[in-house]
């Protein structure tokens, strides 16, 4: 039973360098008083050890070990010799039953002695104990290196001492004469140094005056430099402003020249074609069964067309008869001059109402009438002017005079989408010719 109790006791020391747990050698269990005196003796003895010192060490070893018998756990801390705090970096814990008083007391005493031994060893050297085997080997290597260095120094001192001992009396006299000569040189050099020091003081005063003058000049230079920098900054700002104004004028002149060469009508109204569709500003005018163009796009194209004819008429000073063009985006319309309340919409939303309401057809025929009036007005001043497609306002048709010779209705009722789309394409082509004539008459000049 006692053996099992003893086997439960655990002691743990840690290495003071790497903090790894240590397993102590069995020789620590049989330390006697003579061995303790040998281990704790100083490495270099400068005086005889008094008997009282041995008794003091022995009394430290016999210091009472603190044990808590209520929980069977005894604790002891081993502080390093160079630690200012009373807490230790080395500690161990005894775990066992307090009922076995003799075994616990002997073990506690041995551990206390071991801990005190480590404290004493740490105090005798510059190394904290205990150490593990690897750290001990490293320490031994360092000590060997220091020992070799010390031995080399000792050999050098011995050689110097031997050289001094071999010197004879003549050498001593020569050295004394040399020493006297050096003393005279020293006295002479001291006098020269004093003279140089006096000259240095005079030069220092001159330097101080020159330094004051230099400071004054530096202040004036700094003030002039500051003023120069300010004027330079203002000059750079004015140069930047001047360059900016010149660049703005140059850019404005370039834009002015470009605008002078720009035809407003050509830049604003781009008439072209996309397949079978005539387009104005990329809006398709017309519909096909295979390409059902949205009515919003068709209405927008009509709005651009009305705006173009309205602008051309204003440029020529033309007043249309019977109708007045009202450009209003994708809701543009014509206003009857004979009946002010009658509006002819040039927009449509499709559906069943589109097939029964003929206002949209009347509006397109009225617009064709306005195009015809524009053509006649141009022909008054230029008899050589001719549109590529002849327009029959009474029938609401446009004839392909230069091609198949057929005529195409501009109305949607009782008409196919293909013919209606082709009629609109021919109408846009006539407007493109009218646009080119107005541009040549009013802008190229």
Swiss-Prot record:
InterPro entries xref list: Atg6/Beclin, Atg6/Beclin_C_sf, Atg6/beclin_CC, Atg6_BARA, BH3_dom
Molecular-function GO terms, alphabetical: phosphatidylinositol 3-kinase binding; protein-macromolecule adaptor activity
Keyword Phosphoprotein: no
One cellular-component annotation, GO: mitochondrial membrane
Motif interval(s): BH3: 103-122
PTM field: May be proteolytically processed by caspases; the C-terminal fragment(s) may induce apoptosis.
Pfam families in UniProt: APG6, APG6_N, BH3
Region feature (Required for membrane-association): 420-445
Top-level taxonomic group: Eukaryota
Coiled coil: 137-264
Main location per the UniProt record: cytoplasm
Family: Belongs to the beclin family.
Subunit structure: Component of the PI3K (PI3KC3/PI3K-III/class III phosphatidylinositol 3-kinase) complex.
Protein name per Swiss-Prot or TrEMBL: Beclin-1
């Amino acid at each position: 039973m006692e053996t099992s109790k003893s086997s439960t006791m655990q002691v743990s020391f840690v290495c003071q360098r790497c903090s790894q747990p240590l397993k102590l050698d069995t020789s620590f269990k049989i330390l006697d008083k003579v061995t303790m005196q040998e281990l704790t003796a100083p490495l270099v003895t400068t005086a005889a050890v008094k008997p009282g010192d041995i008794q003091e060490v022995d009394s430290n070893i016999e210091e009472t070990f603190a044990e808590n018998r209520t929980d069977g756990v005894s604790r002891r801390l081993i502080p390093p010799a160079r630690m200012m705090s009373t807490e230790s970096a080395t500690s161990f814990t005894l775990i066992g039953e307090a009922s076995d008083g003799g075994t616990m007391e002997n073990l506690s005493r041995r551990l206390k002695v071991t801990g005190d031994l480590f404290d004493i060893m740490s105090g005798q050297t510059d190394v904290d104990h205990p150490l593990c085997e690897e750290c001990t080997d490293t320490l031994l290597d360092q000590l060997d290196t220091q020992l070799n260095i010390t031995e080399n120094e000792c050999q050098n001192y011995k050689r110097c001492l031997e050289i001094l001992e071999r010197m004879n009396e003549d050498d001593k006299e020569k050295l004394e004469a040399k020493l006297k000569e050096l003393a005279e040189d020293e006295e002479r050099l001291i006098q020269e140094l004093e003279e140089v020091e006096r000259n240095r003081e005079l030069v220092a005063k001159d330097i101080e005056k020159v330094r004051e003058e230099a400071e004054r000049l530096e202040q004036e230079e700094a003030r002039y430099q500051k003023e120069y920098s300010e004027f330079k900054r203002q000059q750079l700002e004015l140069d930047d402003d001047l360059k900016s104004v010149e660049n703005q004028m140059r850019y404005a002149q370039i834009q002015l020249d470009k605008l002078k060469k720009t035809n407003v009508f050509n830049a604003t109204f781009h008439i072209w074609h996309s397949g079978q569709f005539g387009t104005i500003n990329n809006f398709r005018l017309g519909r096909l069964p295979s390409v059902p163009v949205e009515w919003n796009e068709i209405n927008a194209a009509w709005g651009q067309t009305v705006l173009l004819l309205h602008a051309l008429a204003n440029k020529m000073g033309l007043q249309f008869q019977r109708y007045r063009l009202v450009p209003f985006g994708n809701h543009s319309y014509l206003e009857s001059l004979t009946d002010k309340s009658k509006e002819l919409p040039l927009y449509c939303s499709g559906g069943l109402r589109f097939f029964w309401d003929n206002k949209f057809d009347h509006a397109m025929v009225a617009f064709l009438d306005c195009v015809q009036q524009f053509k006649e007005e141009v022909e008054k001043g230029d008899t050589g002017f001719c549109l590529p497609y002849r327009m029959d306002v009474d029938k609401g048709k446009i004839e392909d005079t230069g091609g198949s010779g057929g005529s195409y209705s501009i109305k949607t009722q009782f008409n196919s989408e293909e013919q209606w789309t082709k009629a609109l394409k021919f109408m846009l082509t006539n407007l493109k010719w009218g646009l080119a004539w107005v541009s040549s008459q009013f802008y190229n000049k």
